Amino acid sequence: ILDALDRAIAAGTAGNIAESGRLVSEADASLRGESGLGTLIDNIALVSGLVSRVDQLDVLASGAEAQLESESGLSTREVERRSNELIALRDATWSLRNDRLRTAKAVGELAGKDASASARNAYLSIQQAFSALDRMEVRGRDSAGVHVLVWGHGLDATDKRVAPLLAGRLDDTLFTNGSVRVGAGSRAWSFVYKAAAEIGELGDNTRAMRTTVSN
């Protein structure tokens, strides 16, 4: 992945923005989903290398954009082609920084240290839901909630190590934030997380829910 980004930087430096964007897009695609999360999580060296290269690519794209704006005598078709190449490069680098790296960091914070791969994958689904809620909030929502269904966990609600963690959460008739329901035979459990920051900043609701989930 880092090699692909190094080649993307070299291509962009040589003026081949299209090739640079293609290579960054391929690197971004390789880090999507559960397999990408497994590659990034707790891999400090890789994450540091990615951040450094994405920073370089952003500078490269800004320089190419400034050069395009300063050039005169270009045909409309040429301007359009080069603009589209820059957009593709910027989109790919933005996705690496704000989708892949940000998601891996958020999942790590939700799941905690030493979480299993299956647990991290489950938290990835929760993080994806939170990201969707963040986008919805921009459109004016002032409350949000997530209902999480977990099965195949092998836990027993009556276990003396588990029961204290469920105290006060099983009998909430209003199903408020933090409530839990245990299905027949303890096979499936449902957890609810809710927040309503009617007066506040964008992201307040998901920040509150992330704190509840991680605790």
Residue ranges of model-derived segments:
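N-terminal segments that mediate ammonia production and transfer
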Residues: 1-215
